[in-house]
């Protein structure tokens, strides 16, 4: 096994084709981290010219100290049963990490627990310290240890039927409601950033500046690994649909009124059907007024939600999502999610990752809402083997490990205060 020098394109091709590859190991992802002070180095090992393992090493300075942290997010990308390749990757990583004055090498492989016996044993044998099997969204991890993933390698009907029943009904309703899902361009990031600001204010979290999303889009879109989707509501088109539905409801009432005259047996049923239709008419009249007001203010329509969809080979990722406070009954997010899944499948993906979650949290947990939303999309829980640290500077590592919990608690307090505002 030997060190290899490969191009960025060769690195990315290996990551995209490997079962343990991940978006965060793509070279263009490292470009997105520069804004937050990270810089990258890359390593590869192989035999007889064939690559057998790669890793993208991210480095960040420790504040006020001449040291760095080496973080291999969702790496190494290697077969963890191949001890020789794994050992060679660690040797290469140590060489670079020491040159960059790293106090530790942190990894969190994209390897699931039920397939991770070799990885756990072999990493520990090499001297890595396992950080344990904590909850998926534990503050002790950089990346979530658990994510929710929908298999999308199926036709439209099979995909829809894989969703939970109530969610399936909502998706079908969303498809009828009259919103349009657009695959947007860089210019659409302005709209997306505005929607993200609204979402942050509603849900109580700090949002990123538009430059952050532009950075991701610019780095990854050219290779087809980042797409922006927006959901639009056209008032004129939907007013026509509401008028049609109102006409149908009035015709329905007339039909049941006629039956009441000709059949006493059906009188009770007819009255119930009439009452139901009248309730629907009232709701549609309210909706029509809202749409007419929208048409006056925004005749071209408004955007209700948006999301960034990412790719790494056969894996797709729902990375960031945002939505308006208006016209939520149109279920724009349901329309968007189903459309993005189909788009991802058509572009070679077999899985759709909804991102981090805890495993079946209590209803009073701050993470319950996330889990409840993600579990209804035909998802399974992808539980990773977690984080591992390879310590290079023991005194500094111990000091930072002691200080970290206090910093984490301070961040949590600040976050909770923001949510209460």
UniProtKB/Swiss-Prot annotation:
It catalyses: beta-D-GlcNAc-(1->4)-Mur2Ac(oyl-L-Ala-D-isoglutaminyl-L-Lys-D-Ala-D-Ala)-di-trans,octa-cis-undecaprenyl diphosphate + glycyl-tRNA(Gly) = beta-D-GlcNAc-(1->4)-Mur2Ac(oyl-L-Ala-D-isoglutaminyl-L-Lys-(N(6)-Gly)-D-Ala-D-Ala)-di-trans,octa-cis-undecaprenyl diphosphate + tRNA(Gly) + H(+). GO terms for molecular function: aminoacyltransferase activity. Catalyzes the incorporation of the first glycine of the pentaglycine interpeptide bridge, which is characteristic of the S.aureus peptidoglycan. This glycine is added to the epsilon-amino group of the L-lysine of the membrane-bound lipid II intermediate (GlcNAc-(beta-1,4)-N-acetylmuramic acid(-L-Ala-D-iGln-L-Lys-D-Ala-D-Ala)-pyrophosphoryl-undecaprenol), using glycyl-tRNA(Gly) as donor, in a ribosome-independent mechanism. Involved in methicillin resistance. Since cross-linking between the peptide strands is critical for maintaining stability of the cell wall, FemX is a potential target for the development of new antibacterial agents. Its main location: cytoplasm. It is an enzyme of class 2 (transferase). Its EC number is 2.3.2.16. This is Lipid II:glycine glycyltransferase. It is found in: Cytoplasm. The keyword Methyltransferase does not apply. Monomer. Belongs to the FemABX family. GO terms for biological process: cell wall organization; peptidoglycan biosynthetic process; regulation of cell shape; response to antibiotic. SUPFAM superfamilies: Acyl-CoA N-acyltransferases (Nat). One of its GO terms (cellular component) is cytoplasm. Keywords: Acyltransferase, Antibiotic resistance, Cell shape, Cell wall biogenesis/degradation, Cytoplasm, Peptidoglycan synthesis, Transferase. Pfam families: FemAB (PF02388). It comes from Staphylococcus aureus (strain NCTC 8325 / PS 47). It comes from the Bacteria. InterPro entries: Acyl_CoA_acyltransferase, FEMABX, PG_Glycine_Bridge_Synth.
């Amino acid at each position: 096994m030997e060190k290899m020098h490969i191009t960025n394109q060769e690195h990315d091709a290996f990551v995209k084709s490997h079962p343990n590859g991940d978006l965060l190991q793509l070279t263009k992802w490292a470009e997105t981290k520069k804004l937050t002070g990270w810089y990258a180095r890359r390593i590869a090992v192989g035999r007889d010219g064939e690559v057998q393992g790669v890793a993208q090493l991210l480095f960040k300075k420790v504040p006020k100290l001449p040291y760095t942290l080496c973080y291999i997010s969702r790496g190494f990308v290697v077969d963890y049963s191949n001890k020789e390749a794994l050992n060679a990757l660690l040797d290469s990583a140590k060489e670079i990490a020491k040159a960059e004055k790293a106090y530790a090498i942190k990894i969190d492989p994209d390897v699931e627990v039920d397939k991770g016996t070799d990885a756990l044993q072999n990493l520990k044998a090499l001297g890595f310290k396992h950080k344990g099997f904590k909850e998926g969204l534990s503050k002790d991890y950089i990346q979530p240890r658990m994510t929710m993933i929908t298999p999308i390698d199926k036709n439209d009907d099979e995909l829809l039927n894989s969703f939970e029943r109530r969610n399936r009904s909502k998706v079908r309703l969303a498809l009828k409601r009259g919103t349009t899902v657009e695959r947007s361009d860089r210019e659409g990031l302005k709209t997306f950033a505005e929607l993200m600001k609204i979402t942050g204010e509603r849900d109580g979290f700090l949002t990123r500046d538009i430059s952050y999303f532009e950075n991701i889009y610019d780095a990854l879109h050219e290779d087809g690994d980042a797409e922006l989707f927006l959901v639009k509501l056209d008032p004129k088109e939907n007013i026509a649909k509401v008028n049609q539905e109102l006409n149908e409801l009035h015709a329905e009432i007339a039909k049941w009124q006629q039956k009441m005259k000709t059949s006493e047996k059906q009188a009770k049923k007819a009255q119930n059907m009439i009452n139901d239709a009248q309730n629907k008419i009232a709701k549609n009249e309210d909706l029509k007024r809202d749409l007419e007001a929208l048409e006056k203010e925004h005749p071209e329509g408004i955007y209700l939600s948006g999301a960034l969809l990412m790719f790494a080979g056969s894996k797709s990722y729902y990375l960031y999502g945002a939505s308006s406070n208006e016209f939520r009954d149109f279920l724009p997010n349901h329309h968007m999610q189903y459309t993005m899944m189909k788009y991802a499948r058509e572009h070679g993906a077999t899985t759709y990752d909804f991102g981090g979650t805890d495993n079946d949290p209590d209803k009073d947990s701050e993470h319950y809402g996330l889990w409840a939303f993600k579990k209804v999309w035909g998802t399974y829980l992808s539980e990773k083997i977690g984080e591992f640290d390879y310590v290079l500077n023991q005194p500094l590592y111990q000091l930072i490990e002691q200080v970290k919990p206090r910093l984490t608690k301070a961040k949590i307090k600040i976050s909770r205060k923001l949510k209460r505002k």
